[in-house]
């Protein structure tokens, strides 16, 4: 393939979707570049196929770390380095962004992304048998299975009951018209296998297309330009590849790093590194992620019973700070717990995620070497409002943990511990142990022509440049208030449908 029509950088949640959809046209040649390995659709190793293995435990992670920031300590910034990207190493939760997320984007002037305008793309990616036909897809590439109460562990069933006892309603479908309440999760897991986009979208027949070439184990350094026109990419090591159009789908961390090394970003930062400025744009300046806290318990070994599935239930609710239609707190009950940390040899965690952060962080280059990790400052809990929201969620989780039947499974609370009662105690514990929900977004945000934060337009085209597009979670104007993987697939479906 001498000069493909489209070069896609990154074969993850968005890139695999784009490669499959764009190569449906036999007259369009597509080159997909992936930094990690490319396994056959049915040949992913057990540590990747197993949905209980997450992030670094899969052995296919970038192993980046965040800056210490407000919380005072670095945390892993996991992203998948494999064909399938982060969809191959995540929790396989198949949830959509809320209508209120898209309404918020529209309020900022973004057109074409109202919930009613993207619902068709959510349906196009989905293959499920449950739910209402108006809300669910039946023939898409990604299989989605709805856990039922019977699928949950005894502890997770008790969590549902204790949540209801604390005023949280039940819902039958977190992807349906009423996405508030507690329910078992929809997941892209089939027969115990996490189905990533490298399997679902890049099946054997797709990979055999003569107009699609997949190159694995190649790291892209930067994009090349002739004036303002994209001409191709340069790989780490110096190999140049031509392309009529370049699409960056390297993820919220990878995409802005490539742009910055290419001279697209804040001009002062680029000049400080000796990089010639091609486009002075606010790349990397609007990073957001969801903070998550683990309220952990030592379990009674005689009561805990089966400890699988690890992630299978969630409650969505609103703090006192939430806007109408927003659900800014997610609570979960998980068996992702190291039993060596419990005096009883068993335990569980209630997760508390705050999914409408007001704080923004940054992604900047530490240097020009494409193999050097960028500086990732998530600025988790960087505002008093974010800390107040998470604190409300933690207090609710503790009430649920102290309510039967869930309380009957616990021997004692480990984090924050029974002695932590005041707001100051709890905030100190939050800062010391908070982590990321691993939903980073918004480093290359979409926006209207007049939006000073925007780097790309509604179809992912980079402002002021030709032949360069971005399609991944980095283009979200802000982080959606749900796990983002399904929305990344939706965005790729949406732009593939409208732009090509």
Regions found by a protein language model. Name each.
Residues 106-222, 226-230, 294-298, 306, ...:
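Conserved redox-cofactor binding core of oxidoreductases
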Residues 276, 383-409, 428-432:
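Flavin-binding catalytic cores
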Residues 12-17, 150, 252-253, 475, ...:
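Residue-level detector of alpha-helix initiation sites
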Residues 47-50, 63, 182-193, 215-216, ...:
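A glycine-rich dinucleotide-binding beta-alpha-beta segment and adjacent secondary-structure elements
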Residues 163, 274-276, 395-401, 492-500:
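Internal hydrophobic alpha-helix adjacent to the cofactor/substrate pocket in enzyme cavities
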Residues 27-29, 36-41, 223, 232-307, ...:
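Glycine-rich loop(s) and the adjacent beta-strand/alpha-helix scaffold that form part
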Residues 292-395, 434-442, 470-473, 477-479:
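FAD cofactor-binding and catalytic pocket of flavoenzymes
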Residues 2-123, 272, 276-290, 294-297:
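N-terminal glycine-rich phosphate/pyrophosphate-binding loop and immediately adjacent elements
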């Amino acid at each position: 393939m001498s000069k493909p029509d489209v070069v896609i950088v990154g074969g993850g949640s968005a890139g695999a979707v784009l490669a499959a959809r764009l190569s449906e046209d036999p007259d369009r040649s597509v080159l997909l570049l992936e930094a990690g390995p490319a396994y056959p659709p049915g040949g992913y190793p057990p540590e990747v196929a197993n949905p209980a293995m997450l992030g670094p435990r899969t052995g296919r992670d970038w192993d980046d770390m965040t800056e210490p920031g407000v919380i005072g300590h670095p945390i892993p910034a996991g992203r998948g380095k494999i064909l399938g990207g982060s969809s191959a190493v995540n929790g396989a939760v198949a949830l959509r962004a809320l209508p209120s997320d898209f309404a918020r984007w529209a309020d900022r002037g973004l057109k074409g992304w109202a919930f009613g305008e993207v619902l068709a793309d959510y349906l196009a990616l989905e293959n499920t048998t449950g739910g209402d036909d108006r809300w669910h897809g039946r023939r898409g590439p990604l299989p989605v299975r709805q856990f039922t109460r019977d699928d949950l562990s005894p502890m997770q069933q008790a969590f549902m009951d204790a949540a209801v006892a604390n005023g949280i309603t039940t819902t039958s479908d977190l992807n349906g018209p009423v996405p508030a309440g507690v329910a078992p999760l929809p997941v892209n897991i089939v027969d115990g296998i996490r189905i990533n986009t490298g399997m679902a979208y890049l099946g054997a027949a797709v990979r055999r297309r003569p107009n699609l070439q997949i190159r694995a184990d190649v790291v892209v350094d930067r994009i090349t330009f002739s004036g303002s026109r994209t001409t191709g990419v340069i790989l780490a090591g110096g190999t140049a590849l031509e392309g009529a159009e370049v699409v960056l789908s390297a993820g919220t961390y990878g995409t802005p790093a490539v742009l910055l090394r290419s001279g697209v970003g804040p001009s002062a930062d680029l000049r400080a590194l000796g990089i010639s400025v091609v486009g002075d744009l606010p790349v990397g300046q609007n990073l957001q992620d969801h903070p998550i806290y683990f309220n952990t318990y030592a379990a009674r070994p005689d009561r805990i019973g089966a400890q699988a599935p690890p992630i299978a239930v969630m409650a969505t609710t609103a703090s006192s700070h939430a806007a109408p239609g927003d659900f800014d707190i997610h609570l979960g009950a998980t068996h992702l717990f190291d039993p060596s940390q419990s005096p009883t040899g068993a335990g569980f965690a209630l997760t508390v995620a705050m999914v409408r952060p007001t704080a923004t962080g940054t992604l900047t280059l530490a240097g020009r070497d494409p193999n050097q990790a960028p500086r990732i400052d998530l600025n988790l809990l960087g505002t008093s409002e974010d800390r107040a929201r998470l604190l409300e969620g933690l207090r609710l989780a503790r009430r649920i943990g102290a309510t039967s039947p869930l309380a009957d499974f616990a021997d004692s609370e480990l984090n924050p511990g029974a002695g932590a009662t005041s707001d100051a105690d709890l905030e100190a514990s939050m800062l010391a142990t908070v982590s990321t929900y691993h939903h980073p977004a918004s480093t290359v945000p979409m926006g209207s022509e007049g939006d000073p934060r925007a780097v790309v337009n509604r179809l992912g085209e980079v402002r002021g440049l030709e032949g360069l597009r971005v399609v991944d979670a980095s283009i979200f104007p802000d982080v959606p208030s749900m796990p983002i993987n399904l929305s990344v697939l939706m965005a790729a479906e949406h732009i593939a449908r409208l732009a090509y």
